[in-house]
Amino acid sequence: MAKEQLSAIPAVQMKRTFQAPREKAFRAWTDARELAPWFAPSAEYSTVVTELDLNVGGQYCIEIHHKGGNVHKVMGTYREIEPPEKLAFTWRWENDPSASESVVTVEFRDLGPATEILLTHELLPSAEEREKHGHGWEGCLAQLAKYL
C-alpha cells in the first residue's frame, strides 16, 4: 500500500486520566515487571515481556497469551524516550510478516496526583486494522487503570 494511502487512514487516538503520579504511569510502560501485569486487551490474556531495551534504538518484544492457547507477539524499536513525558516506538506483529510497521506515541501529562495519557497509534495499514487496534488499546488502557 502506498505511503499516501497509509497516511489517509486516521490514527487511533485516546486520552485517559489515571489516578497515579506521572512517574508511576511512565514506569508502567517502561519497566518489564510493571508492563506485564496489565499490557493486554482483557483479563482473558496474560503477558510476557521477553525483551525490553529502554534506549532509543533499543528493541522490545511482548508475548500476549490468550487463555485459549493463542499467542500473539508484538515487537518494535524505541524511537523517543523522554522520561516521564513521552515514549514513542514502532509496532509490528510477528505472526503477520506482511504487516507494515506502525508507530505508537504515548504522552504523559502531569496532573499532580493523576496523569493524563494521550496515546496515538498511526500508520496502520487499513481501516480494519485501525478498528482492531482501537479496541485493543481500549482494553489495554482499562487494564492499566486497574493496575495503577
Where on the chain are the PLM-derived regions?
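Short beta-edge strand/loop motif at the mouth of beta-sheet-based domains
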Residues: 13-14, 33-71
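Intrinsic-disorder/low-complexity, polar/charged segments enriched in Ser/Thr/Lys/Arg/Asp/Glu/Gln
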Residues: 9-15, 22, 47, 59, ...
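Hydrophobic pocket/interface hotspot
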Residues: 25, 35, 60, 78, ...
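Short amphipathic alpha-helical signal-transduction/dimerization elements
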Residues: 30, 141-148
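Hydrophobic ligand-binding cavity/cleft-lining segments
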Residues: 1-46
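Beta-strand/loop substructures that line and gate deep hydrophobic ligand-binding cavities in soluble
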Residues: 88-138
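A short, structured loop/turn motif at beta-sheet edges
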Residues: 22-23, 54-55, 79-85, 107-116
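Hydrophobic/aromatic beta-strand elements that line small-molecule binding cavities or substrate pockets
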Residues: 16, 50, 74-80, 91, ...
